[in-house]
């Protein structure tokens, strides 16, 4: 398994006093992927996409928003798994916390708010 999903840019430079960072979420494989975006700090960070489907070589915009707060070592985790149907509902696939299937995994993005 390689890098199935990545973000461009791969880092999130948001100030501790708040802000917005826009990224491209890219599917690098030849499979349809369902995804779930999780944050280690839901008090300060939110995203425009929580669940979704990335078609083969698809790109979606992920907008990360930070509320003002103390800077700390936070991260976003993009869990993913292969699906056969691009119209599948991705939410139930992540109900157990671990994405199912042979082609599954996660991409971790470090969130480093600067003062």
UniProtKB/Swiss-Prot annotation:
Protein name per UniProt: Uncharacterized protein ZK1307.3
PROSITE patterns: MSP
Signal peptide location: none
Occurrences of domain MSP (ranges): 1-115
Cited PANTHER family: MAJOR SPERM PROTEIN (PTHR22947), MSP DOMAIN-CONTAINING PROTEIN (PTHR22947:SF40)
Disulphide bridges: none
Lineage: Eukaryota, Metazoa, Ecdysozoa, Nematoda, Chromadorea
Pfam family, one: Motile_Sperm
Lineage: superkingdom: Eukaryota
InterPro entries: Ig-like_fold, MSP_dom, PapD-like_sf, Sperm-specific_class_P
